[in-house]
């Protein structure tokens, strides 16, 4: 069987299973219980469409990346379609940030976000021959998936700040303002001792190749990185929760691996009781001045005990006060509760990643282990004050669920995002320079706003954060020059990712006539130094989306 035939197997089996279920329904099988559906994932493309020349070309390019699933695993996967035929993936649909007139709202405030789960999840949809639902696309997580060459701190602060202004590729009348933050890095050997609790969902919904088997392989990658001073506990939950492994030294790697290997899936999902028990184990193994973190591996399909969103989120908020962070690692398809996974990590002062293959697991838990585990700054907030003499309108690209009130910036009681060692954070504003055509009609009776400060300043950037050890917040202020020039590769590439995220949502109200072909060309020309092939992979994903949209 050719590799291309193997890549076509999943849509074929999915189509076969759906036809089989329709036939059964026609024989009189019915249900009186009507299930309320959250936003459904996009339906798989027809086989004829996936066999077209554009899609085949895009799929062939993907062969250079991690190998596809074997035919045997795909066949096993198809046997579970009876409960997978009704997509139950849950996403939060947030409207795009609005356009603001500087004369009316000169200040923009938001919390940083270092999550990257949206990008990996979107990649999963495209690799399956499907376009992602709108709610799965979070622009800031897609942009922040990639590393950028930002300046490191030189003044003793935990991160450096970079700004850049250049032309917008999709609108000749606007400019892109890029704000970049680069946290100081640390080698794994330099990290404080770690007390880690692996909290694993072993319920029936995880009994599939991309569920528990991938979780086990992922956790064993992390086990290989453990040091003697680290300790690990293993807690599992299905219908009930239990401790599989008490706090164990990182030197006992064989013992930890054996405990992971023995895990099997089956039963309902009492996620809340598992989280409670995991925090209990974290307290039992707590390391003063160390890294204390729970890593929750699940599809988020909680259905026993406390399962409502607000109660689970409040539980994470309450427990973070104990000094234990919560990282969520998303696995699985069809019943995946992405909204819960992202919000639990935010509430638990952790980070969220989606693991769609072992390569992504290595990126998160090996290549970026220091970023995943070690916090260098807490409650990081960004505030931009635009100069009305230079800018008439602006909009923040992404960060819709991170918006803060202006007064929240100076309030240390308001929670915000954490930044890990080596993390990069990117924020993009699309701005309308004074005198250029904007999105909003000018007011008839409004007077011209007066400039304050230096007229050469485009804006003032303020960054507020707390040290990793806690305490009062500190402030960094940087004026942003109105000088714009040739865009760097980093800005051009991040602009391509931002364009792609907007194009996937489909309405094109901001990206105008810029096509997916234009986006792929821009990203291809801005790949620069790409040691891990991440930017090249992005180009291929854009090409796949282009084929699927035709």
What feature does the model see in each segment?
Residues 1-11:
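N-terminal secretory signal peptides that target proteins for export/translocation
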Residues 28-186, 512-550:
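Subset of Sec-pathway N-terminal targeting signals
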Residues 113, 162-164, 180-182, 199, ...:
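Residue-level recognition of well-ordered beta-strand positions that form the cores
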Residues 28-41, 160-380, 407, 440-452, ...:
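Exposed acidic/Ser/Thr-rich ligand/metal-binding surfaces
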Residues 101-104, 108, 117-123, 374-378, ...:
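Long, acidic serine/threonine- and proline-rich intrinsically disordered regions
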Residues 23-26:
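C-terminal motif of bacterial Sec signal peptides marking the signal peptidase cleavage site
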């Amino acid at each position: 069987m050719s590799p291309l035939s193997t890549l076509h197997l999943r849509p074929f089996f999915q189509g076969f299973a759906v036809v089989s279920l329709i036939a059964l329904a026609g024989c009189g099988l019915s249900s009186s219980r009507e299930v309320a559906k959250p936003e459904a994932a996009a339906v798989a493309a027809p086989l004829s469409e996936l066999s077209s020349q554009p899609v085949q070309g895009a799929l062939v390019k993907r062969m250079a990346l991690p190998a596809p699933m074997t035919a045997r695993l795909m066949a096993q996967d198809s046997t579970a379609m009876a409960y997978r035929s009704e997509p139950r993936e849950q996403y939060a649909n947030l409207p795009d940030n609005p356009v603001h007139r500087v004369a009316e709202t000169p200040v923009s405030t938001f919390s940083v976000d270092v999550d990257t789960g949206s990008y990996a999840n979107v990649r999963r949809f495209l690799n399956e021959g499907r376009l992602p639902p709108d709610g799965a696309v979070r622009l800031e997580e897609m942009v922040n998936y990639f590393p950028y060459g930002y300046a490191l701190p030189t003044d003793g602060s935990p991160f450096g700040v970079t700004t850049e202004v250049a032309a917008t590729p999709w609108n000749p009348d606007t400019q892109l303002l890029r704000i970049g933050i680069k946290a100081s890095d640390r080698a794994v050997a330099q990290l404080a001792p770690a007390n880690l609790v692996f909290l694993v969902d072993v319920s029936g919904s995880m009994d599939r190749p991309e569920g528990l088997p991938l979780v086990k392989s992922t956790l064993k990658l992390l086990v290989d990185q453990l040091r003697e001073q680290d300790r690990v506990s293993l807690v599992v939950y299905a219908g009930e929760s239990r401790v599989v492994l008490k706090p164990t030294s990182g030197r006992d790697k064989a013992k930890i691996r054996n405990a992971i290997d023995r895990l099997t899936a089956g039963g309902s999902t009492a996620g809340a009781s598992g989280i409670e028990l995991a925090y209990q184990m974290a307290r039992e193994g707590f390391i003063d001045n160390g890294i204390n973190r729970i890593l929750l591996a699940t599809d988020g399909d909680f259905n026993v005990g406390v399962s409502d969103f607000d109660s689970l989120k409040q539980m994470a908020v309450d427990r973070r006060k104990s000094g234990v962070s919560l990282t969520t690692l998303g696995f699985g398809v069809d019943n995946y509760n992405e909204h819960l996974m992202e919000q639990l990590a935010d509430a638990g002062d952790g980070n969220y990643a989606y693991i769609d293959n072992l390569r992504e697991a290595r990126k998160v838990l090996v290549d970026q282990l220091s970023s995943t585990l070690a916090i260098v700054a807490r409650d990081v907030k960004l505030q931009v004050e635009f100069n009305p003499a230079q800018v008439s309108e602006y909009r923040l690209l992404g960060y819709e669920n991170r918006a803060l009130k202006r007064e929240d910036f100076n309030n240390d009681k308001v929670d915000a995002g954490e930044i890990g060692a080596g993390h990069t954070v990117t924020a993009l504003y699309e701005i309308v320079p004074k005198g250029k055509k904007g999105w909003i009609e000018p007011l008839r009776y409004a007077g011209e706003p007066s400039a304050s400060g230096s007229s050469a300043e485009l804006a003032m950037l303020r960054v507020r954060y707390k040290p990793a050890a806690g305490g009062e917040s500190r402030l960094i202020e940087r004026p942003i020059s109105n000088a714009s020039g040739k865009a760097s590769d980093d800005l051009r590439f991040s602009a391509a990712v931002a364009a792609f995220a907007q194009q996937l949502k489909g309405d094109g109200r901001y990206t105008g006539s810029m096509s997916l072909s234009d986006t792929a060309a821009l990203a291809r020309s801005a790949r620069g130094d790409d040691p891990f092939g991440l930017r090249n992979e992005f180009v291929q994903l854009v090409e796949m989306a282009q084929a699927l949209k035709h």
